[in-house]
Amino acid sequence: MANKLRNYTINFGPQHPAAHGVLRMILELEGETIVRADPHIGLLHRGTEKLAETKTYLQALPYMDRLDYVSMMVNEQAYCLAVEKLAGIDVPIRAQYIRVMFAEVTRILNHLMGIGSHAFDIGAMTAILYAFRDREELMDLYEAVSGARMHAAYFRPGGVYRDLPDFMPKYESSKFRNAKVLKQLNESREGTMLDFIDAFCERFPKNIDTLETLLTDNRIWKQRTVGIGVVSPERAMQKGFTGVMLRGSGVEWDVRKTQPYEVYDKMDFDIPVGVNGDCYDRYLCRMEEMRQSVRIIKQCSEWLRVNPGPVITTNHKFAPPKRTEMKTGMEDLIHHFKLFTEGMHVPEGETYTAVEHPKGEFGVYIISDGANKPYRLKIRAPGFAHLQGMDEMAKGHMLADVVAIIGTQDIVFGEVDR
C-alpha cells in the first residue's frame, strides 16, 4: 500500500512572543517546510475609523497615536495634513520644521524598536538592550514637549501644541542611581532642548556603529536573514508594498522625495535602497535610514535656533488663542469655548493625504460634509499590505524563518487591525 503524505497544520500565535502583537497564523507544513501561511487579522480591531466619525476633528486626533503605537507622531502628522488641506489652513514655517524634526525622531524610535526586536526574536538578545538605551532619550524628548512618553497628541491641525521648551527636565536622585550615574545622565540636559538634540545627534551615529558591530557581519544573523523572504521589485509593487519593504527590493520610492510635504523639499538627505529584496537588505536600509534621519534632525535644529516665530496658526476658527489672551479678551474666550465644545467646521470636500511613515506609506482619506466631524475617515496602514505578502514570502522556508519574516515586515497590529 502506498504511503499517503499529509501536511501538518499548526497555529502560530496569537500569544506567540515573536508575533509582534496579536498575530494569528495558520501554518501548513510539510515536515518543517512551510507550504502555506494564512494570517488571521482583526483581533485588535477597535473601530478607530468609525469612532473618529463620532468625534470632532480635534477629539479624533489622539486616536491616531494609538494606531501604530511605535510611530506616534507620524500618524498625527498624516491626519493633521489631511485636515489642513481640507480646511485650507496655513501652517507657520517654524511649526513645519518642528514637525519634520519630530517625525524623524519618531523614525529613529521605530527603527530602533524594529531592529532590536527583530534581532531578539531571532535569538540575538544584546541588540535590543543597546536600542532601548537610545530610545529612552528620545522618549524624554516626547515627554518634554507633550507631557506623554508615547501618546503625545503634539501635532495639531494648524501647527503644534506648543513651542520647544527652553530646558530639558533632569533626572532626580533616587535609591537606584548614585551621584556618579546621575551626573552622567544629566550631563547633556544642562542647556535647551535643541542643545540636548544636538548632543544626541553627535553621539548617536557611534551607537549605530555599535549596533552594526553586533549584527551586520555576524555570521548567525546573516544565515538567518540573507536570502530569506525575498520579494522582487515587480511583486513588491503589485502587492502594494511601501517604505523599507519596497526600497529593500530596489525601488527608489519615498514620499518625502517624490511628493514632498512640510519642509522636506528643503532638506538634504539620501534614500537608501536595497538590491536583493531579502531580510538582510531591509535591515541595512533601516540602519542607513537612521543615519539619514540624524542628518535631517541636525538641519532642522540649525534652522530652529535662528528662526523664532509662531508654532500654530493664528486663525482662531481652527486653533485656540494663547492662554494669556484668553484671560483678558472676551472674543478669545469665546473662540476657545467654541473650539473645545463644538469643534472646528471643515469645508465640504475630500482628500487623501499620505506621509512617509517609518513602516511605509501611511495615508488618511477624509470626506467632509461641512460639519464639525468627519463624514468618513479611512486609514491606509502600510502594515496591512505587508502582512498580505506573508504567504508568498514564507512559502518554501523553514518554520523558524517565519519569525525573521515577521520581524522584517515590522508589523504593529494597532494599525493593521485599526
Swiss-Prot record:
PROSITE patterns, A to Z: COMPLEX1_49K (PS00535)
Catalytic activity field: a quinone + NADH + 5 H(+)(in) = a quinol + NAD(+) + 4 H(+)(out)
Entry's Gene Ontology cellular component terms: plasma membrane
Top-rank lineage group of the source organism: Bacteria
MF terms (GO), sorted A to Z: NAD binding; NADH:ubiquinone reductase (non-electrogenic) activity; quinone binding
UniProt subcellular location: Cell inner membrane
Keywords: Cell inner membrane, Cell membrane, Membrane, NAD, Quinone, Translocase, Transport, Ubiquinone
Enzyme class, broadest EC rank: translocase
Bilayer disposition of the protein: Peripheral membrane protein
Record-linked InterPro entries: NADH_Q_OxRdtase_suD, NADH_UbQ_OxRdtase_49kDa_CS, NDH1_su_D/H, NiFe-Hase_large
NAD found in the keyword field: yes
Major location (coarse): membrane
EC nos: 7.1.1.-
Free-text function comment from the UniProt entry: NDH-1 shuttles electrons from NADH, via FMN and iron-sulfur (Fe-S) centers, to quinones in the respiratory chain. The immediate electron acceptor for the enzyme in this species is believed to be ubiquinone. Couples the redox reaction to proton translocation (for every two electrons transferred, four hydrogen ions are translocated across the cytoplasmic membrane), and thus conserves the redox energy in a proton gradient.
Quaternary structure and partners: NDH-1 is composed of 14 different subunits. Subunits NuoB, C, D, E, F, and G constitute the peripheral sector of the complex.
Family indicated by similarity: Belongs to the complex I 49 kDa subunit family.
PANTHER family xrefs: NADH DEHYDROGENASE [UBIQUINONE] IRON-SULFUR PROTEIN 2, MITOCHONDRIAL, NADH-UBIQUINONE OXIDOREDUCTASE 49 KDA SUBUNIT
This protein's name: NADH-quinone oxidoreductase subunit D
Species, as recorded: Neisseria meningitidis serogroup C / serotype 2a (strain ATCC 700532 / DSM 15464 / FAM18)
Gene for this chain: nuoD
